Amino acid sequence: MANATSGVAVSEECKARFQELRAGRAHRFVVFKIDDAMRQVVVDRVGPRDAGFDELTASLPADGCRYAVYDHDFTVSDATATAAAGEGGEAPRSKIFFVSWSPAAADVRSKMVYASSNEGFKKELDGVQIDLQATDPSELTLDVLKDHTS
């Protein structure tokens, strides 16, 4: 179904790849783009489970908008984690980030369509936990992810 604000639909493949990431943990990340006709969000790239964060950031073009989801694994060390993990005091956690990538070099029309489709697309991805917006590589680093998980 098309987004009421932008008229952009979401392909079934987008939903399927997201579910594989969320429920099956089959992928580390999925990058999405709006097709050239500006009618539908489609899958642009899927990162294998062993992919690093740098592979996600390398998948985001310097002159084009994208959406992405990233399954970020990290550990916590606090009283709850200590009780759950035993002596080590660290417990594994995972958060799914939704990234809206809109670099300064992208054309204005593309930025407008991505911005107006953003909320509708996120609603199709049930299970996203943290929302990030980035316009520059410095806004999308492991330190930024860490800040959102601590």
Swiss-Prot record:
Keywords: Actin-binding, Stress response. The keyword RNA-binding does not apply. Induction: By drought stress (at protein level). It holds the Pfam family Cofilin_ADF. Gene3D superfamilies: Severin. Residues 7-150 form the ADF-H domain. It comes from the Eukaryota. One of its GO terms (cellular component) is cytoplasm. One of its GO terms (biological process) is actin filament depolymerization. One of its GO terms (molecular function) is actin filament binding. Belongs to the actin-binding proteins ADF family. Actin-depolymerizing protein. Severs actin filaments (F-actin) and binds to actin monomers. This is Actin-depolymerizing factor 3. It comes from Oryza sativa subsp. japonica.
